[in-house]
């Protein structure tokens, strides 16, 4: 059986999911090469900082919406059948204020919070809240069951799924994407490189995608459990400030957020912003603390900052010949990397097959 030597560059959720799906074909011999691996916490490495959850933000017929739809069955299956993966179901409410429509966060959440969304036919227990169930200042709200992911458990679990299929992991840093072809564990040059370097594709030689930009997210992790996952279309504190909370599976704590600050590279938590985040979360979900308590009722584990890899034209999944090396890109997933992970990885695998077939045809033609 002919083998395909493939290097996946990057070990975030996109790289690991793509490597796992590729490894299900025994003809693919895969090396994951990355500067950062699960267990690391670095501002360059976005995936560990994510909440993470499944709150669809793509329009129904958009690429993002289709990838979100394709990802849900996988996350549902893992939550149901693989508790060791760190994904669990959560009762979820998303609130909408009409006045947020023009804001940065209002635009980001527009599909999520609108009445009768496409995902209402996909996620279990969906219903729109009646007018008498709405808190003051809320124009409409959707309630449903979704999932929350403990990234500190899930990312290593993905590594384990890859390892069971023979994927080799190695730490490496490359100045140019074509150099990654020399990192295959066989010692031979890889037939193809899959670029899943996220925001680092902005400076990676051979790629240098200047349409990538950071959308800074700041969070507070607490021991309190509000009893549900909750979000709202905007805040009164700032155009790029967000309010959401989710409790991670397997004792991962509750994430309180947040921000969506484009072009902001600051890796240090802002203490004043942290106070605003905590106050907003308690206001949105009073069950977060004991009756009558404010932020003093929160038991803080840590503060965190991550940089979402936003791309102006959305995720890039396509093949390209760079310095004689076939490269398939899968990066630029913004704030929806986990909830599009399987959809995007499936598309990337299809593009890998196309590139390998094209490569084979060129070799066959050269022999004639």
Swiss-Prot record:
UniProt binding sites for anthranilate 1: 244, 308
Residues noted as binding (R)-lactate in the record, renumbered to the chain: 244, 260, 308
Pfam family, one: DAO
Enzyme class: oxidoreductase
TM stretches of this protein: none
Principal place of residence: other
Gene Ontology terms describing biological process: D-amino acid catabolic process; D-amino acid metabolic process; nitrogen utilization
Subunit composition and interactions: Homotetramer.
Descriptive protein name: D-amino-acid oxidase
Species this protein is from: Talaromyces emersonii (Thermophilic fungus)
């Amino acid at each position: 059986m002919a083998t395909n030597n493939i290097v996946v560059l990057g070990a975030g959720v996109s790289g690991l999911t793509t490597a796992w799906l590729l490894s299900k074909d025994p003809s693919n011999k895969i090396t994951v090469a990355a500067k950062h691996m699960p267990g690391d916490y670095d501002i360059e490495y976005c995936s560990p900082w994510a909440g993470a959850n499944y709150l669809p933000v793509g329009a129904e017929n958009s690429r993002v919406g289709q990838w979100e739809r394709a990802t849900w069955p996988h996350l549902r299956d893992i939550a149901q059948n693989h508790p060791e993966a760190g994904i669990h179901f959560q009762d979820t409410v998303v609130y909408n204020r009409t006045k947020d429509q023009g804001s940065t966060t209002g635009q980001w959440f527009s599909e999520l919070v609108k009445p009768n969304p496409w995902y209402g036919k996909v996620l279990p227990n969906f219903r729109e809240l009646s007018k008498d169930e709405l808190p003051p200042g809320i124009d409409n709200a959707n309630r449903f069951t979704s999932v929350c992911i403990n990234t500190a458990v899930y990312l290593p679990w993905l590594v384990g799924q890859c390892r069971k299929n023979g994927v080799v992991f190695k730490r490496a840093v490359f100045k140019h994407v074509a150099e990654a072809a020399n990192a295959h564990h066989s010692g031979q040059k890889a037939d193809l490189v899959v670029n899943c370097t996220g925001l680092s594709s902005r400076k990676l030689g051979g790629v240098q995608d200047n349409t990538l930009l950071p959308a800074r997210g700041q969070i507070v992790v607490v021991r309190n459990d509000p009893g549900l996952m909750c979000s709202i279309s905007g805040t009164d504190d700032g155009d790029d400030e967000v309010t959401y909370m989710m409790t991670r599976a397997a004792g991962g704590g509750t994430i309180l957020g947040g921000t969506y600050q484009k072009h902001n590279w600051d890796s240090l938590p802002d203490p004043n912003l942290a106070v605003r985040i905590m106050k907003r979360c308690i206001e949105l979900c009073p069950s977060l603390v004991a009756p009558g308590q404010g932020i003093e009722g929160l038991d803080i584990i840590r503060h965190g900052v991550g940089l979402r890899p936003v791309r102006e034209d959305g995720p890039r999944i396509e093949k390209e010949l760079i310095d004689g090396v076939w490269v398939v890109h899968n990066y630029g997933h913004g704030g929806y990397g986990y909830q599009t992970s399987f959809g995007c990885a499936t598309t990337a695998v299809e593009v890998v097959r196309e590139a390998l077939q094209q490569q084979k045809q060129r070799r066959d033609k050269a022999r004639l």
